[in-house]
């Protein structure tokens, strides 16, 4: 049954490919003849190696390549002629039974793309998150920016910013410099001793018992106290054990936050020092972050809704291909993090089975919904998105050139626009419930890709 595609199941197919031996022999000889012109062998000049020696050395390998090249070409011709959409790569096996003497036969097993049924989008439920940016959010951001530019001054010292008050004892928010030594059963341990150690009280950098013991100390004072390390402490050699610590305070400095004035605005890149312009820029940046996060959350909601209302079988070949991509992505990530031997590290593909299945499913669903509803990314849409992105930069035209000068970056923006088209299309048809959350709640939620 040469050239007839057999149905082996939902997506599995098989076709027998018959190839005349004469064709294989003819092409093998042609390839060997071309090879003989460049092959190098000891004792012969390039191109002067006898054909018999070339055949002996390379004949079997070349014939093997010709067989499978012809099988692949024949497979492509048959599936294309019958308009069969092949998913992934076919598997070729040599067939030996029931084959004519003057032919070679292969059995190609493969999968086809599934039929994708998109259900009733009107029944899909999507939550659309909304967040408003007001003065309170801008004020909080200004406070964060002030804390990032904090200056510390010694308590009790008079100066341009005062002395931080008459109380020279260490308080939460103060930066302290101290020496400490810890012992377990009277013996010092690794990491339990330091000189001129600096940290800010109340930020949670140290264990609570350590910070509590430091509070209220004045310069020159010492204090001894017991400290029990948590059972899950990162230092396994001391986890769950009790140490006796002694701390000696050497310096206490209070935090001076810069005033919100023209000098502060200039430090943030506002050329004329306008506080009003600074706040406007902060609002714009916060609104951009809100747009990014809410769009990502909405996209995730839409994708989940599409998965729920769609029916399709998933080709194993595509899942396996995506597993390989995810393994390589994980390996590159480990390399970037400085993991030694990341290139050779064994990463089981099975770790990514569920993720790959979901990605393949969504890819097939999106392709179907885009094709059926004409949701392809239009050039003017892509340009509008790039222009919107470029507005936040000093030289928008340079950003535009940067995007249009690289096909990969342009393809990424095209994919983004296409996803937007799908999201908008689904939201127009689905049951959409708006949910308003604060900026703090929005940023506390896990960021979506």
Swiss-Prot record:
| PROSITE patterns from the UniProt entry | FKBP_PPIASE (PS50059)
Q: Which reaction does it catalyse?
A: [protein]-peptidylproline (omega=180) = [protein]-peptidylproline (omega=0)
Stated EC number for the protein is 5.2.1.8
Q: Does the keyword Cytoplasm apply?
A: yes
Query: Gene3D superfamilies, per this entry?
Result: 3.10.50.40, Trigger factor ribosome-binding domain, Trigger factor, C-terminal domain
Query: What Pfam families does the entry give?
Result: FKBP_C, Trigger_C, Trigger_N
Q: Which HAMAP family match?
A: Trigger_factor_Tig
Protein family membership: Belongs to the FKBP-type PPIase family. Tig subfamily.
Query: Any idea what job this protein has?
Result: Involved in protein export. Acts as a chaperone by maintaining the newly synthesized protein in an open conformation. Functions as a peptidyl-prolyl cis-trans isomerase.
- Give the protein name, as stated in the record: Trigger factor
Q: Which organism is it from?
A: Cupriavidus metallidurans (strain ATCC 43123 / DSM 2839 / NBRC 102507 / CH34)
């Amino acid at each position: 049954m040469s050239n007839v595609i057999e149905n082996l199941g939902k997506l599995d197919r098989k076709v027998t490919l018959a190839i005349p031996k004469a064709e294989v022999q003819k092409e093998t000889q042609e390839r060997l003849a071309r090879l003989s012109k460049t092959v190098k062998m000891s004792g012969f000049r390039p191109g002067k190696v006898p054909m018999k020696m070339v055949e002996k050395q390379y004949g079997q390998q070349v014939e093997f390549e010709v067989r499978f090249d012809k099988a692949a070409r024949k497979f492509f011709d048959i599936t294309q002629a019958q308009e069969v959409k092949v998913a992934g790569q076919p598997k070729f096996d040599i067939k030996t039974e029931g084959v004519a003497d003057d032919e070679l036969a292969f059995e190609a097993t493969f999968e086809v793309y599934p039929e994708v049924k998109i259900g009733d989008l009107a029944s899909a439920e999507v939550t659309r998150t909304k967040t408003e940016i007001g003065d309170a959010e801008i004020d909080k951001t200004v406070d964060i920016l002030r804390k990032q530019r904090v200056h510390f001054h010694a308590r009790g010292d008079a100066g341009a910013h005062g002395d931080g008050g008459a109380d020279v004892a260490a308080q939460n928010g103060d930066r302290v410099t101290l020496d400490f030594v810890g012992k377990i059963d009277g013996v010092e341990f690794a990491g339990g001793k330091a000189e001129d150690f600096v940290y800010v009280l109340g930020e949670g950098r140290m264990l609570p018992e350590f910070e509590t013991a430091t509070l209220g100390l004045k310069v020159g004072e010492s204090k001894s106290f017991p400290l029990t390390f948590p059972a899950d402490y990162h230092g396994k050699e001391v986890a769950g054990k009790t140490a006796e610590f002694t701390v000696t305070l050497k310096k206490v400095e209070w935090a001076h936050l810069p005033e919100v004035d023209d000098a502060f605005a200039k430090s943030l890149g506002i050329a004329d020092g306008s506080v009003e312009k600074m706040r406007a820029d902060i609002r714009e940046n916060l609104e951009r972050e809100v747009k990014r996060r809410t769009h990502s959350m909405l996209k995730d909601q839409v994708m989940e809704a599409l998965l729920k209302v769609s029916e399709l079988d998933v080709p194993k070949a595509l899942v396996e291909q995506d597993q390989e991509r995810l393994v390589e992505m994980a390996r590159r990530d480990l390399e970037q993090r400085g993991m030694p031997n990341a290139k050779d590290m064994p990463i089981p593909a099975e770790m990514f089975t569920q993720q790959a299945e979901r990605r393949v499913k969504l890819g097939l669903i999106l392709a179907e919904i885009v094709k059926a509803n004409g949701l392809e990314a239009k050039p003017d849409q892509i340009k509008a998105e790039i222009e919107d992105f470029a507005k936040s930069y000093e030289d928008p035209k340079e950003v535009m050139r940067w995007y249009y000068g690289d096909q990969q970056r342009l393809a990424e923006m095209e994919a983004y626009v296409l996803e937007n088209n799908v999201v908008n299309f689904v939201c127009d048809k689905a049951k959409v419930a708006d949910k308003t959350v604060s900026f703090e709640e929005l940023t506390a939620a896990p960021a979506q890709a």
